[in-house]
Regions:
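C-terminal boundary and immediately downstream tail of ABC-type ATPase nucleotide-binding domains
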Residues: 230-258
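Short, Lys/Arg-enriched, disordered terminal segments
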Residues: 1-6, 258
Length: 258
């Protein structure tokens, strides 16, 4: 039986990022993500996880290195790089839905304006996606009428409307009430099962273990451990990762005991 070799989708080579005061944020970051793979970035606050996603998306300048999508450069302001970055989707902690537009109009805006798609086709896809996340009855509602979890589900399918090759998720449940976290994570889990390539930053450890094909652990702007989710959560290679997981275990016990 032949082994299926996955193609590289994203490659990052020796990425360097510093703030304006020259303090380094990302230090010699190199990683790759294969098509259909889900890679989870873990690490303490301030380790550079979210900044890494923002640099991939072109929202932050870099001081060195390469970011390639299917072998093509996506760094910089050139028309070619900007066009390639349209193959990326990103969902943030904040939903960033336009408050004066209905949910349906929020979903239609980018496909029609950026990709020039016909309204009829875009409406059909938007309704199919709303049905997938159980929000068919909300297409004419406005963002203020939705819960946080519902808004985040809309934000996810708004990115899917652009048919991204790679999805970036930056702490998408961080701003949600605990009861709303599951409904959003279920959507992301379903996307992984459908083969969507994803790079995910999260502090939801149980979710990370369930969804990841690989775990990258960051500390001080560097990748200090790469592992399978099974090995990382059972017996991480580095002492720093062990401390990190012990801290989360302590937090969980504290919450359970209250």
């Amino acid at each position: 039986m032949e082994e299926i070799v996955q193609e590289q989708l994203l490659e990052i080579k020796h990425l360097e990022k510093s703030y304006e005061d020259d303090s380094p944020v990302l230090k010699d970051i190199s990683l790759s993500v294969k098509k259909g793979e889900v890679v989870v970035l873990l690490g303490p606050s301030g380790c550079g996880k979210s900044t890494l996603l923002r640099t991939i998306m072109g929202l932050e300048h870099i001081q060195g290195g390469e970011i390639l999508l299917e072998g093509k450069n996506i760094v910089g302001k050139s028309e070619e790089a900007r066009k390639e970055r349209q193959n990326l989707g990103m969902v943030f902690q904040s939903y960033d839905l336009f408050p004066h537009m209905s949910i349906l109009e929020n979903l239609l805006l980018a496909p029609m304006k950026v990709q020039g798609r016909k309204r009829e086709e875009a409406v059909q896809e938007a309704r199919e996606l709303l049905a997938r996340v159980h929000l068919s009855d909300k297409e004419n509602a406005y963002p203020s009428m939705l819960s946080g979890g519902q808004k985040q589900r809309v934000a996810i399918i708004r990115s899917l409307m652009m048919h991204p090759k790679l999805m970036l998720f930056d702490e998408v449940t961080a701003a949600l009430d605990p009861e709303m976290v599951r409904e959003v994570l279920d959507v992301v889990m379903e996307l992984s099962e459908q083969g969507l390539t994803m790079l995910i930053v999260t502090h939801e450890m149980g979710f990370a273990k369930a969804v990841a094909d690989r775990v990258l652990f960051l500390e001080g702007g560097k990748i200090v451990e790469e592992n399978t989710p099974e090995n990382f959560f059972q017996k991480p290679d580095t002492e720093r990762a062990q401390q990190f997981l012990q801290n989360f275990s302590y937090v969980s016990h504290r919450h359970v005991g209250r």
